[in-house]
From Swiss-Prot:
PANTHER family for the chain: 4-HYDROXY-TETRAHYDRODIPICOLINATE REDUCTASE 1, CHLOROPLASTIC-RELATED, DIHYDRODIPICOLINATE REDUCTASE
Species per Swiss-Prot/TrEMBL record: Bartonella quintana (strain Toulouse) (Rochalimaea quintana)
UniProt-recorded name of the protein: 4-hydroxy-tetrahydrodipicolinate reductase
SS bond list: none
Similarity remark: Belongs to the DapB family.
Catalytic function, reaction form: (S)-2,3,4,5-tetrahydrodipicolinate + NAD(+) + H2O = (2S,4S)-4-hydroxy-2,3,4,5-tetrahydrodipicolinate + NADH + H(+); (S)-2,3,4,5-tetrahydrodipicolinate + NADP(+) + H2O = (2S,4S)-4-hydroxy-2,3,4,5-tetrahydrodipicolinate + NADPH + H(+)
Classification lineage: Bacteria, Pseudomonadati, Pseudomonadota, Alphaproteobacteria, Hyphomicrobiales
Positions with a binding annotation for (S)-2,3,4,5-tetrahydrodipicolinate: H156, G165, T166
Amino acid sequence: MRLTVVGANGKMGRELITAIQRREDVELCAVLVRKGSPFVDKDASILTGSDFLNIRITDDPENAFSNTEGILDFSQPQASILYANYAAQKSLVHIIGTTGFSKTEEEKIADFAKDTTIVKSGNMSLGVNLLASLVKKAAKALEVDDFDIEIYEMHHSGKVDAPSGTALLLGQAAAEGRNVMLKNVSVNARNGYTGEREKGTIGFACSRGGTVVGDHSITFAGPNERIVLSHVAQDRSIFANGALKAALWAKNHENGLYSMLDVLGLKDEF
């Protein structure tokens, strides 16, 4: 499968290029960076320190998408909307690992998915998606009046959105387990005099620092006991490999908006 990596000079872009080179069932077709990037017209190998790849880095989407079958996208929300439009027009598979979308942007992506196959997830790893399944089951089983839910995440100092897409994915799982809307029960910050914790809310706490790839934990705090579920990402390759798995899966599926739960066969479990 021929693939284009967008946002290629970012951490995940570089990881995706490396992951593609290690496999025989996918091929790096093009590499796209932002307009005016100093990497334009250089060989893609400069991004990974690998041997010469004979793929010229471009900042022109038309050029990058002219001979590809799929787009691997861990960029920024505004850019992802642009790429989703291209994907819909050209019937290209679009794998979206970008996070931080607004409600309006989410609606646009859903609309574009009518004309192409999109897999969108706040986290592409098997472990996190299994964790989400467990979180939903736990939230459903534990009484709201007895157990409070708190989600904690930590990422590297360069991450620009909070809570992370993964934290929100886990929060959504917990909310679905309790049959409520996350937006109605989430508490994203506590500061100063907050009063007592409101029953049924789902709290989020975020930290940024160092080179942390991604730590997430979900605590169900009840009377005299706590249940803690967690996931630690040690290397970004787990996200890259998940994205490639999603692309190959999407190639053989009808137009629509899917998640990694679909790709991993966890939808029914979830």
